[in-house]
From Swiss-Prot:
Keyword line: Ribonucleoprotein, Ribosomal protein, RNA-binding, rRNA-binding, tRNA-binding
GO cellular component: cytosolic large ribosomal subunit
Source species of the chain: Enterobacter sp. (strain 638)
Protein name per UniProt: Large ribosomal subunit protein uL16
HAMAP family: Ribosomal_uL16
Family: Belongs to the universal ribosomal protein uL16 family.
Summary of subunit composition and partner proteins: Part of the 50S ribosomal subunit.
PANTHER family, A to Z: 50S/60S RIBOSOMAL PROTEIN L16, LARGE RIBOSOMAL SUBUNIT PROTEIN UL16M
Length: 136
């Protein structure tokens, strides 16, 4: 599972997921899976989508993961009263804005890439679209 090795602070404020995305172009591979909606991806969701893609292409070609879960999400245990401090870190998320390229792929035919990204998109909680590299 993806998570930072070290962080400056253990816990962070909730914050807001506003603004425009960085990394909106396919830069490493030929095909990409781009976010259309806004949301957050957990490390488990990122890994599940990666596994689905890898199995679909039968381990040929190359896959790049363009998102990293660097925000800790805390939760308090069940049936615990309010107060007594912030809960423990339970999982890590990556905040996603519209236009962000989530995954890239190279070395496979376009039909296979579309199929693999379709399987991966089914694992993700945000709406996505298939994109190809634009040559200037």
């Amino acid at each position: 599972m993806l998570q930072p090795k070290r962080t400056k602070f253990r816990k962070v404020h909730k914050g807001r997921n506003r603004g425009l995305a960085q990394g909106t172009d396919v830069s490493f591979g030929t095909f990409g899976l781009k976010a259309v909606g806004r949301g957050r991806l957990t490390a488990r969701q990122i890994e599940a989508a990666r596994r689905a893609m890898t199995r679909a292409v039968k381990r040929q070609g190359k896959i790049w993961i363009r998102v990293f879960p660097d925000k800790p999400i805390t939760e308090k245990p069940l049936e615990v009263r309010m107060g007594k401090g912030k809960g423990n870190v339970e999982y890590w998320v990556a905040l996603i804005q519209p236009g962000k390229v989530l995954y890239e792929m190279d070395g496979v035919p376009e039909e296979l890439a579309r199929e693999a990204f379709g399987l991966a998109a089914a694992k993700l909680p945000i709406k996505t679209t298939f994109v190809t590299k634009t040559v200037m």
